[in-house]
Amino acid sequence: MKLTCVVIVAVLFLTACQLITAETYSRGEQKHRALSSTDKNSKLTRTCNTPTQYCTLHRHCCSLYCHKTIHACA
């Protein structure tokens, strides 16, 4: 009888642990999805320099090419 009670308590404890872990994981996953969506939106709305505008890096230009010598977008 005591062994049966111990086994039942152990099963209930392990089930509760799994449910808590699953709930925490799903919440974290949802937060991650929200951040991912925000990141995608920021990439879609980024501004870039048009040709002949000043640049220092390729990513500043809409064409993704910056002339190193004249520091202008292609």
Curated annotation (Swiss-Prot):
Tissues in which the protein is found: Expressed by the venom duct.
Keyword list, A-Z: Calcium channel impairing toxin, Disulfide bond, Ion channel impairing toxin, Knottin, Neurotoxin, Presynaptic neurotoxin, Secreted, Signal, Toxin, Voltage-gated calcium channel impairing toxin
Top-level taxon of the source organism: Eukaryota
Propeptide residues according to the Swiss-Prot or TrEMBL record: 23-46
Signal peptide limits: 1-22
Compartment annotation: Secreted
A GO CC term attached to the entry: host cell presynaptic membrane
InterPro entries: Conotoxin (IPR004214), Conotoxin_omega-typ_CS (IPR012321)
One MF annotation (Gene Ontology) recorded for this entry: calcium channel regulator activity
Major subcellular location class: secreted
Disulfide bond annotation, renumbered to this chain: 48-62, 55-66, 61-73
Record remark: domains: The presence of a 'disulfide through disulfide knot' structurally defines this protein as a knottin. The cysteine framework is VI/VII (C-C-CC-C-C).
Function text: Omega-conotoxins act at presynaptic membranes, they bind and block voltage-gated calcium channels (Cav).
Family classification: Belongs to the conotoxin O1 superfamily.
Protein name: Omega-conotoxin-like PuIIA
Species for this entry: Conus pulicarius (Flea-bitten cone)
